[in-house]
């Protein structure tokens, strides 16, 4: 949560003069020359959520034509992948600045693509630093419904306005037609705006969802350093040292891409640490995890563990100033208690992490408490209606445009 999201400033096409400058690269046209929905997800978790949503959409509307700026999961689900945006995901203010030119070019190419090909809707999936600015640019370009055009702008998975930059809700109401949230408490965060907001349930609790992790007291320790290159490079070495200080025989690590696999190998893990690609079901007796999406998966599975966070010092200092929440892990935030103790920056020492693993594996009361907390999480996030997010999207696409600012 203290991650400084991709903050791209002043990314606007020069429209006052009407001049269209040549772009460093262009996105390919949609498959078959036509498109109904453009999905945009810039992180691995968003790619997974988008893929699940796309499969549900295909079950309800098999003729729907979907293009995507996303990743391999959305491509495998049937999306026409224009660019693998997940391979370009960065974290932290310093890292964003280093990649500014690339993101500016991508931003402008995306605006141009939407102007030319006019999908019925653009579905933004999380990734607010890029996506919210794109929604604003589409309004200013008079492409979106909010700007007087004909492209609906929809957002799936709310930005964490309850953690920082709460005033974004007003610009979201101005630029978006509707928002679907995956956490029930988020609906109230927009109660003072005109933005239509609906809780559609968390995708991890969908009826067809197969959890990627499960608890097994005889299984190895699970180490989850995350899905972003810079974050993994900072977190994985300390996870390794904590595991080695604990003295367990084996550990497993799940990686989402070949890029992250290379980062893991660069840390020279011992032979007792097995690197596994995503896709299967991994058993674990305890987990040391980053604060990302997989931490919630582990919590829902009832695996005892802890959250570990290390960032660029400048990024962390800025995050402490901006973020106004008591916890980093989403499970802790939802429960309003530390289901997963958090070890942040200098507190994430090998000795502290080894002690945490001993507690997770050796204390039966810890496991029992984790099970109770996991059930509370499931009750909090469950949505009784099947395929709610897909139904929401199709309903929004069928509604008559309302060209009014929020």
Where are these regions (language model features)?
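Nucleotide-activated sugar donor-binding and catalytic core shared by glycosyltransferases
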Residues: 1-406
């Amino acid at each position: 949560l203290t991650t400084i999201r991709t903050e791209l400033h002043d990314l606007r096409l020069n429209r006052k003069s009407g001049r269209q400058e040549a772009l460093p690269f262009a996105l390919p046209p949609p498959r078959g020359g036509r498109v109904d929905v453009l999905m945009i997800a810039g992180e691995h978790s968003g790619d997974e959520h988008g893929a699940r949503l796309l499969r549900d959409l295909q079950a309800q509307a098999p003729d729907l034509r979907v293009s995507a700026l996303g990743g391999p999961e959305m491509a495998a689900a049937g999306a026409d992948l224009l660019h693998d945006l997940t391979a370009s995901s960065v974290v932290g203010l310093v890292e964003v600045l280093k990649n500014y030119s690339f993101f500016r070019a991508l931003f402008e190419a995306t605006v141009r693509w939407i102007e030319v090909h006019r999908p019925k809707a653009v579905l933004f999936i999380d990734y607010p630093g890029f996506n919210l600015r794109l929604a604003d640019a589409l309004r200013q370009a008079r492409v979106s419904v909010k700007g007087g055009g004909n492209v609906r702008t929809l957002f799936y998975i709310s930005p964490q306005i309850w953690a920082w930059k709460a005033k974004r809700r007003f610009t979201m109401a101005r630029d978006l037609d509707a928002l679907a949230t995956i956490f029930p408490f988020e609906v109230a965060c927009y109660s003072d705006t005109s933005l239509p907001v609906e809780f559609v349930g968390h995708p991890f609790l969908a009826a067809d969802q197969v959890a990627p992790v499960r608890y097994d007291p005889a299984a190895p320790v699970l180490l989850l350093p995350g899905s972003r290159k810079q974050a993994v490079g900072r977190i994985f070495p300390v996870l390794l040292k904590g595991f080695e200080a604990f003295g367990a025989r084996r550990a497993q690590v799940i990686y989402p891409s070949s890029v992250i696999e290379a980062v893991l190998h660069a840390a020279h893990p011992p032979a007792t640490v097995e690197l596994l690609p995503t896709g299967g079901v991994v058993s674990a007796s305890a987990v040391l995890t980053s604060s990302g999406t997989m931490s919630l998966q582990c919590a829902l599975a009832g695996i005892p563990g802890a959250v570990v966070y290390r960032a660029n010092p400048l990024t962390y200092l800025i995050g402490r100033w901006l973020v106004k929440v008591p916890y980093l892990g989403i499970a802790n935030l939802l429960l309003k208690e530390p289901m997963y103790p958090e070890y942040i920056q200098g507190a994430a020492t090998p000795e502290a992490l080894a002690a945490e693993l001993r507690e997770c594996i050796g204390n039966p009361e810890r496991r029992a408490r984790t099970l109770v907390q996991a059930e509370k999480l499931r009750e909090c996030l469950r949505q009784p209606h099947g395929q709610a997010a897909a139904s929401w999207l199709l309903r929004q696409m069928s509604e008559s445009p309302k060209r009014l600012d929020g």
